């Protein structure tokens, strides 16, 4: 399964099955490896989140402690629960331990390269459950589309750097509460810490840490993620933010879809890697 990078990638206040209330709907344009941009739409509710791309959808239900990865073309979905994720993490930890044993017999230089590659992917025995994120100002304020933002280089523990242009939440008409489900999704996925699921700084969004470093609560209007090997580059640009009711059933599995196991080979969306949070 491919990781959600989220845009990442970004992202309703609706009460399922009852009267519609205003939601936060964030629309992004994401380009992978220089290809034409594709739309990514995020719907945010207090404890619900949906990230949609042309190929896949990811639905986070904080009220149920579940994530669904939905593939409309297959009429199928994968369900992630804390119990299932703990099982997956144990399996991946075992695989990484076997990899470490094989690496022990490698020539020093080759072993060093492998260790660096795994660390860059947020994997390995020393990978932190919650990566440390550092923001370094990288230029003067500028305009990206209709938004004013300040450039920052964003680095994660033992990982590659991303280029962000960050606007203040107030300038975007957002509050921390609007992004509450986005933060909740990142915390949910942190249960897979050390397995490479949190390669995007946005997947570990911490407003307190961000404000302490850059001086304000912000959100990226432009991100650029480049993998160390140069084979995976993701550029994401914020197009619009609206407060409106999302379509009925936005946070539910479509009727008639079949549940598949994690091993069924379904790819997941990701902003920077499907739907993704900003990288």
Language-model features: locations:
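Extended soluble regions of mature proteins
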Residues: 21-279
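N-terminal signal peptide c-region/cleavage motif recognized by signal peptidases
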Residues: 17-18
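Bacterial N-terminal signal peptides that target proteins for export
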Residues: 1-8
